[in-house]
Amino acid sequence: MRKQKMNRDWIATARTLSEALPYMQRYSGAVVVVKFGGNAMGDDEAMAEFARDIVLMKQVGIHPVVCHGGGPMINDLLGKLGIESRFVRGKRVTTRETVEVVEMVLSGLVNKRIVQAINDAGGRAVGISGKDDDLMVCEPDDPELGFVGRPVEMNVQIIRDLYNAGLIPVIAPVATGMEDNETFNVNGDTAAGAIAGALRADRLLLLTDVAGVKDASGEVLTAMHPDQVRAMIADGTIAGGMIPKTETALKALDEGVRAVVILDGRVPNACLLELFTEHGAGSLIRSTEPRVKPRGLRQGDSGL
């Protein structure tokens, strides 16, 4: 009985791999930017599973670029230091006092934890921040937010150099200001969107702690046109923390990203489900093509 069950499991695994092959072929050579949010990081096992997904993507010819957040970790350290976390319209208020803590957590703690997890999974990851090689240069986003930056200049050649050398870039969202070399905290989604736009990425995956964008009845929408997203923001269907994520998606599409997906990073193998299965995972936003595609690929159809 045990042998029969093992055989069935092996057959199912082999079938899954076989069905994934056309999607792996489609994405070979593609640039996929993955925003790994603090809320999606979970425990060490969740981190290890995410790292294995990223290494597999690299192994099959994708160029994954990881941009991460770290809000819960920042809140935790600020709390230990007796500093209150404040937010305006869902964005962190970053004072001169807290920006050093933010940089320490993002660049020194979270970034290196992700790099180590990817390396432990057999990949070759390199951790950098938006400051390195002037990758991201910012202006103040909003006077109410303090040292929170909005990227205005991007130099992504360092990212291309890394992934073309077989490395996996892992980017902490802190950046240099246009004036006086001030340090700015950049919202993780904003940073990922700006990086994806500058790279003209094939996919931007925004991993979060919800299943995707929901309609008025609470159902997750698996595919959306940008005009539909704008209408849902205007009528209040998209609200709260989903507004900045969908606005990031729209801006990234305007800047040349082929498609954006908002998906639940807590789901095991979420990135692989999105890229290598017929129905994907989460909410896909793009201007053309439906979510559900036939298994048989048309000659010359990139499918991205």
Curated annotation (Swiss-Prot):
Reaction(s) this enzyme catalyzes, per UniProt: N-acetyl-L-glutamate + ATP = N-acetyl-L-glutamyl 5-phosphate + ADP
A Pfam family assignment: AA_kinase
UniProt cross-references to SUPFAM superfamilies, sorted A to Z: Carbamate kinase-like
GO biological process, one term: L-arginine biosynthetic process
Subcellular location: Cytoplasm
Pathway(s) the chain acts in: Amino-acid biosynthesis; L-arginine biosynthesis; N(2)-acetyl-L-ornithine from L-glutamate: step 2/4
Residues where substrate binds: 70-71, 92, 185
GO molecular function list: acetylglutamate kinase activity; ATP binding
CDD domains according to UniProt: AAK_NAGK-C
Keyword line: Amino-acid biosynthesis, Arginine biosynthesis, ATP-binding, Cytoplasm, Kinase, Nucleotide-binding, Transferase
EC number per UniProt: 2.7.2.8
Gene Ontology CC terms: cytoplasm
Enzyme class: transferase
Residues at the site labelled Transition state stabilizer: 35, 245
Family in the record: Belongs to the acetylglutamate kinase family. ArgB subfamily.
NCBIfam families recorded: argB (TIGR00761)
Cited function: Catalyzes the ATP-dependent phosphorylation of N-acetyl-L-glutamate.
PANTHER family reported in the protein's UniProt record: N-ACETYLGLUTAMATE SYNTHASE, N-ACETYLGLUTAMATE SYNTHASE, MITOCHONDRIAL
Name recorded for this polypeptide: Acetylglutamate kinase
Source organism per UniProt: Paracoccus denitrificans (strain Pd 1222)
